[in-house]
């Protein structure tokens, strides 16, 4: 993670679509999607060509990863005491086409079919793997440009406009 604050994806896609007039694709976790789920109303009312792909791992995955790495797997509010609504039904209530898929072939087929049109759609991708690895990701004690897994230092220096911070 670390590419935007949790909940940022859906409103950012709305802004990008309104600004460019082009289709946007949202890739979001189930927790981040819940933070601005009401924006489905804007997508429907303005008939915006936005595809929402929810990577649904039934937990707050990025927060859970932090709990694994830094809090001795003390899962508070991420696995224990966490739930998510039926996203397919919520999208349908807003009048937006919605799908729930699982399994690699079904996921692949749905993505291909969804990208062939410009209709608004919500695709709830049900993840079954309990592992929670996100790459690249931020480390607590590193600057934003120095994500994990680490990039070769000389390569990082070539890409940076300023000298990278050494910690």
Model-found features: residue ranges?
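Thiamine diphosphate
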Residues: 1-167
């Amino acid at each position: 993670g670390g590419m935007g604050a949790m909940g940022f994806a859906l409103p950012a896609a709305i802004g990008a679509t309104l600004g460019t007039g082009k289709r946007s694709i949202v890739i979001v976790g189930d927790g981040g999607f819940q933070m601005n789920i009401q924006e489905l109303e804007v997508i429907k009312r303005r008939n915006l060509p936005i595809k929402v792909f929810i990577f649904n791992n039934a937990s707050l995955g990025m927060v859970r990863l932090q709990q694994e790495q830094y809090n001795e797997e003390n899962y508070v509010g991420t696995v224990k005491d966490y739930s998510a609504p039926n996203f397919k039904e919520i999208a349908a209530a807003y009048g937006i086409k919605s799908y729930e898929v699982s399994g690699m072939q079904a996921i692949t087929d749905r993505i291909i079919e969804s990208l062939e049109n410009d209709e608004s759609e919500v695709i709830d991708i049900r993840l079954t793997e309990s592992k929670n690895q996100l790459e690249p990701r931020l480390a607590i004690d590193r600057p934003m440009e120095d994500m994990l897994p680490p990039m070769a230092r000389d390569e990082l220096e070539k890409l940076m406009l300023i000298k990278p911070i050494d910690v």
